[in-house]
């Protein structure tokens, strides 16, 4: 069961993109900044970008058909455009957020990070931006995030600070009210349990080897 997170000031009139559409947009934003020579992206390159194991929270495994369906939906919403370069039979895709939502620079970079890595603090966004955008400081991040929140419908929202958190986090609103999955906590627990089981199995194997060696010495 998903539980809605509380937004500072509320989260009304949000967008309604599914997880695949959000990931496709985030990947296009990132690659436009990081690999401009290879942008726009082919479907194959886009799938690879969506399924990266680094800088992705959560890691996803989209198939070509998943990405293609997401592209079709985004094209219908005028958020993505398909291009067929002269002399090429392979279509390429680019986002149109700067046209449709009138955002660029710091605001695009902040939205990119939120779509790819989920809720984050302003400091985390600045630290993770890397070559996507060089924020001058946390204040510039906050300015960009507030500009996204002031759009209509809003593109981002500041979450209420949770117990144990030093700073409030920000989230995108491209999929409606922000949701949290309790299963995520279970996955973390499962990873820890798997590690302990593996360590115990290795210890048992080592003990068996010692017993076998001792038996061989006694029988010899």
Curated annotation (Swiss-Prot):
Q: Which InterPro entries match?
A: DUF480, WH-like_DNA-bd_sf, WH_DNA-bd_sf
**Which domain of life, per UniProt?**
Bacteria
Q: Which organism is it from?
A: Chromobacterium violaceum (strain ATCC 12472 / DSM 30191 / JCM 1249 / CCUG 213 / NBRC 12614 / NCIMB 9131 / NCTC 9757 / MK)
**Can you say what this protein is called?**
UPF0502 protein CV_4303
Q: Which Pfam families does this chain map to?
A: DUF480
Q: Which family does it belong to?
A: Belongs to the UPF0502 family.
| Leader sequence residues | none
Q: Which Gene3D superfamilies match?
A: Winged helix-like DNA-binding domain superfamily/Winged helix DNA-binding domain
């Amino acid at each position: 069961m998903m539980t809605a997170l509380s937004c500072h000031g509320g989260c009304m009139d949000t967008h309604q993109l599914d997880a695949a559409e959000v990931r496709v947009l985030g990947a296009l934003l990132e690659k436009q900044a990081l690999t401009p020579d290879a942008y726009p992206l082919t479907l194959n390159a886009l799938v690879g970008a969506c399924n990266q194991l680094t800088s992705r929270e959560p890691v996803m495994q989209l198939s070509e058909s998943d990405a293609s369906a997401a592209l079709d939906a985004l094209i219908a919403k005028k958020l993505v455009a398909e291009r067929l370069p002269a002399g090429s039979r392979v279509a390429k895709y680019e986002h149109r957020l700067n046209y449709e939502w009138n955002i660029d620079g710091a605001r695009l970079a902040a939205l990119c990070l939120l779509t790819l890595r989920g809720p984050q603090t302003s400091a985390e966004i600045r630290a993770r931006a890397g070559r996507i955008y060089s924020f001058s400081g946390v204040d510039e991040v906050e300015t960009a995030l507030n500009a996204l929140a002031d759009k209509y419908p809003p593109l981002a929202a500041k979450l209420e600070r949770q117990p144990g958190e030093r700073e409030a986090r920000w989230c995108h609103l491209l999929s409606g009210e922000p949701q949290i999955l309790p299963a995520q906590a279970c996955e973390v627990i499962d990873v820890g349990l798997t590690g302990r089981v593996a360590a115990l199995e290795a210890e048992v194997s080592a003990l068996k080897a010692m017993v076998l060696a001792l038996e061989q010495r006694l029988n010899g």
